[in-house]
């Protein structure tokens, strides 16, 4: 759940940044409804229960209602949606409007079977992409902590040039407080 909350809180901080751009013709304080965060879990048995607890704390998941068979047919996935007004940081502390967090529209897709990453991408583009018809899609792996303005800069690349079909951000290792993460050889390399 720490990796999930690290990523989700980073996304929430980015949505707050979009809404802080008061001189923007696209964004501003009421810009948050233009963003939908889709979380796809690859297999009900594979997702960690504490991650589900974090999603429940955000209001987008309810434990105990998902069934694997309905009307004698196997269920492929369970879809939940909610507009949350709080975020959970890495320390599992709630952050809300008092900390600059704005509402966030969320879709949580809990796939019944673990079908791997490409299948999750297909779910995102074929199911949710067709329904939402987004102008820009940004894919993040769990554990990635986007800087507070990173998603804005990715969006801006698409907004400024209609010929841009893809963009990538820079990935940096989190060195931790006092750069203690550098004691880990994987981080240090």
From Swiss-Prot:
Pfam families: Chitin_synth_1
Keyword Ligase annotated: no
Reaction(s) catalysed by this chain's protein: [(1->4)-N-acetyl-beta-D-glucosaminyl](n) + UDP-N-acetyl-alpha-D-glucosamine = [(1->4)-N-acetyl-beta-D-glucosaminyl](n+1) + UDP + H(+)
Keywords: Cell membrane, Cell wall biogenesis/degradation, Glycosyltransferase, Membrane, Transferase, Transmembrane
KW Disulfide bond (keyword) present: no
UniProt subcellular location: Cell membrane
Biological process annotations from GO: cell wall organization; chitin biosynthetic process
Membrane topology category: Multi-pass membrane protein
Top EC class of this enzyme: transferase
GO CC list: cell septum; plasma membrane
PANTHER family: CHITIN SYNTHASE (PTHR22914), CHITIN SYNTHASE 2 (PTHR22914:SF38)
Protein name: Chitin synthase 2
Organism: Exophiala exophialae
Native organism taxonomy: Eukaryota, Fungi, Dikarya, Ascomycota, Pezizomycotina
Gene name of the encoded protein: CHS2
